[in-house]
Amino acid sequence: EYAETNFELTVTSFLHENLRGLRRSMGSTKFEKQLIKQMKRTGTVAMCKLDNNTVLEKGLYYYQGNDFASELVYSIARLCEPCLEHTDNNFNPLDAIQKGEFGDVAEDITYLIQQCRKKLESNDYNDFEEEVRRANDLNAQLSHLKRQELQRIQSQTGSVRVSMIY
């Protein structure tokens, strides 16, 4: 739920130049980082009290889960930080084309996150390959957008500073 909420908050706040929303997302991200760090410490202490067979059997899953959660939080922070800095410094906003392209992809990413969350919550992994395919398609779409932006930079049709954040 954290990833879905904060990804959406970061993107919509950035597209609408909402500094308060970006700060809220960054604060939430810092809180989540601390929470994961605390859970990792607590889990490590708990692992010391379990017998070796149980630790070997279940410990790996615990640490992998923490690592995956950390990656999600780190990714949201890597998205939010430059958006916050860009908006806070009153740099030029994205132009209408960039907003449209990025907004469309962001909606698709939010939908993918929602679908994955539903599958995890219901413990139903049927057709999970469909979500993996959708994620790969979104990666390709993001690469395509990056190439288009590089072409705009080359043709000097936009602001370099705005292109950097895009």
Language model regions located:
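Cytosolic, long alpha-helical scaffolding segments
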Residues: 1-166
